[in-house]
C-alpha cells in the first residue's frame, strides 16, 4: 500500500512539475492570405498574392516559447495577369524552378499590447535575411463547435534587391509592401 501511495504521489508530482506545452495551431488555408503590392513606373501599383500558403504556430503563456513558421509555394503567384505571372516565375524574378518556396521561421517572440513582436529568418530566392514585424490579433473563437481557432495579421515592407531580385530596377519598385492575415486551427 505504501508503495502504491508513493507511486500515486510521484505521478501527481510529475503532472504538476511537467512544463505546460504551447498550444499548437495549423494554418487554415481558407482563412489565410499573403498579398503584396509593388510600384510600376512610379505611376501605379501592381497587386498580387500567393495562393498556396501553409504553416504552423505555437502560442505559449511565456511568449518567448511561442513560435511561427510559414511556407509559400512560389508557383502559386497570382497578379491576375498570366503573362506577368509567367515572367515573375522566371529566372528574372522568383525562379520557381530553383526556388520553389519562400519560408519564414521565427527566432524570437515577445508579447506586446495587442499581439506579438516577432523576429525570424525569411528565406526567399536563395537568400536568408532576418526580419521583424508585429503580429496583431490573438483573439480566440470556437467555430464550428469544437474547433478552436485564433488569428493574426501584419503588414511589412521588404526590398526585393536584398533577396537578389533586382531585374528591371528602373521600371519596378524595389520596395514590396506585404500583407499577411491568417487563422490557425488548434491541433
Summary of predicted features, one role per range:
Residues 20-187:
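Low-complexity, acidic/polar, glycine-enriched regions of mature
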Residues 6-15:
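Bacterial N-terminal signal peptides
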Residues 1-2:
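N-terminal secretory signal peptides that target proteins for export/translocation
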